[in-house]
From Swiss-Prot:
The lineage of its organism: Bacteria, Pseudomonadati, Pseudomonadota, Gammaproteobacteria, Enterobacterales. Catalyzes the hydrolysis of UDP-3-O-myristoyl-N-acetylglucosamine to form UDP-3-O-myristoylglucosamine and acetate, the committed step in lipid A biosynthesis. One of its GO terms (cellular component) is membrane. It comes from the Bacteria. Belongs to the LpxC family. The gene is lpxC. Keywords: Hydrolase, Lipid A biosynthesis, Lipid biosynthesis, Lipid metabolism, Metal-binding, Zinc. Its EC number is 3.5.1.108. GO terms for biological process: lipid A biosynthetic process. The active site is at H265 (proton donor). This is UDP-3-O-acyl-N-acetylglucosamine deacetylase. Pathway: Glycolipid biosynthesis; lipid IV(A) biosynthesis; lipid IV(A) from (3R)-3-hydroxytetradecanoyl-[acyl-carrier-protein] and UDP-N-acetyl-alpha-D-glucosamine: step 2/6. The keyword Signal does not apply. GO terms for molecular function: metal ion binding; UDP-3-O-acyl-N-acetylglucosamine deacetylase activity.
C-alpha cells in the first residue's frame, strides 16, 4: 500500500518573524500515523495546538493565518505548508516559540531543505488522498479559482499585474505536480511586495521582518533586489506556491486539476472549503500499490532516500 509519511528525526532552525521582526525558533517533530499536520505555539502556557484545517483559516490579509475558537492565532504558515505538500508529509508537529512561522527567504526552499535533512519515514498506515469528483468553482469579482476531476495534480495559475517589472508573457504558469517538479520549479519562488507598502506597514508597527532578504521588493518601475529574480516568472510561480500551501490545509494531497485567475489566499481557501462542503464533489482514496498511484505522487529518490 501507499503509506503515510512523517519525519525520521527532530530538526530545528531559526529565522525572523515577518510581522514581529523577532527571532523565531522552529522545531519540526515526527508524529504517529493519522496525527495530521499540527502547528504548535510553545510561547504560550500551556502550548496551543492548531491542526491544519481549512475552516481554521480566518485572516488572509498578508498571509495565511490559523485562528482557534479562543481567537489565538498562528501566522505565515503557507510556505511551510507548501513544502509539506511538495514532499507529501502527512504527519508532523511544527513548534514555534512565537505567534508566527519564520519567513526565512520568503520561499519554501529552506523548509524543503529542513524536511529533507530530517529524512522522510514511511508509516505502516495507508495514505489518504482527496480526489475531486466534480468541478467546483468560486469567484470574487473578476477573480476565480476552480477544481476539476483529473487523475493527478495539475496547476494552471494566471496573474494580471500591470507593472513594468512583470512582462505580460510571464503572468501564467502551468505544471503537472510532482515532488521533483515542486522542488525544482516552485519551491524557490519568493514572496513579493511594494517598497511603499512595506514602509507604510513598518511605520504602523507591522511587517517588521520585511526586507530584501525575505522578499522580492519592487517600486513603481523595477525590482530593487540586487540579485534580481530567481526566475523570469518568479511572481506567478510564487502565487502557485501559495496556492499549493493553501490547498494542503485539508491535510491531504489532492488528486485533481486546479485552475486559477488572480486568486490569492482568501479565494484559495474559499475554493477548498467549497469543495469539502459539497460531499458529492470529492472522496477519500487510498492506493494498494505504486502502479495505481497517479504519477504526481510517486516519491523521488531524494525524498525517500
Amino acid at each position: 500500500m501507499i503509506k503515510q509519511r512523517t519525519l525520521k528525526r527532530i530538526v530545528q532552525a531559526t529565522g525572523v518573524g515577518l510581522h514581529t521582526g523577532k527571532k523565531v525558533t522552529l522545531t519540526l517533530r515526527p508524529a504517529p500515523a493519522n496525527t495530521g499536520v499540527i502547528y504548535r505555539r510553545t510561547d504560550l502556557n500551556p502550548p496551543v495546538d492548531f491542526p491544519a484545517d481549512a475552516k481554521s483559516v480566518r485572516d488572509t490579509m498578508l498571509c495565511t493565518c490559523l485562528v482557534n475558537e479562543h481567537d489565538v492565532r498562528i501566522s505565515t504558515v503557507e510556505h511551510l505548508n507548501a513544502a509539506l505538500a511538495g514532499l507529501g508529509i502527512d504527519n508532523i508537529v511544527i513548534e514555534v516559540n512565537a505567534p508566527e512561522i519564520p519567513i526565512m527567504d520568503g520561499s519554501a526552499a529552506p523548509f524543503v531543505y529542513l524536511l529533507l535533512d530530517a529524512g522522510i519515514d514511511e508509516l505502516n498506515c495507508a495514505k489518504k488522498f482527496v480526489r475531486i469528483k466534480e468541478t467546483v468553482r468560486v469567484e470574487d469579482g473578476d477573480k476565480w479559482a476552480e477544481f476539476k476531476p483529473y487523475n493527478g495534480f495539475s496547476l494552471d495559475f494566471t496573474i494580471d499585474f500591470n507593472h513594468p517589472a512583470i512582462d505580460s508573457s510571464n503572468q501564467r504558469y502551468a505544471m503537472n505536480f510532482s515532488a521533483d517538479a515542486f522542488m525544482r520549479q516552485i519551491s524557490r519562488a519568493r514572496t513579493f511586495g511594494f517598497m511603499r507598502d512595506i514602509e507604510y506597514l513598518q511605520s504602523r508597527g507591522l511587517c517588521l521582518g520585511g526586507s530584501f532578504d525575505c522578499a522580492i521588493v519592487v517600486d513603481d518601475y523595477r525590482v530593487l533586489n540586487e540579485d534580481g529574480l530567481r526566475f523570469e516568472d518568479e511572481f506567478v510561480r510564487h502565487k502557485m506556491l501559495d496556492a499549493i500551501g493553501d490547498l494542503f490545509m485539508c491535510g491531504h494531497n489532492i488528486i485533481g486539476a486546479f485552475i486559477a485567475y488572480k486568486s490569492g489566499h482568501a479565494l484559495n481557501n474559499k475554493l477548498l472549503q467549497a469543495v469539502l462542503a459539497k460531499q458529492e464533489a470529492w472522496e477519500y482514496v487510498t492506493f494498494q500499490d505504486d502502479a495505481e498511484l497517479p504519477l504526481a505522487f510517486k516519491a523521488p529518490s531524494a525524498v525517500l532516500a
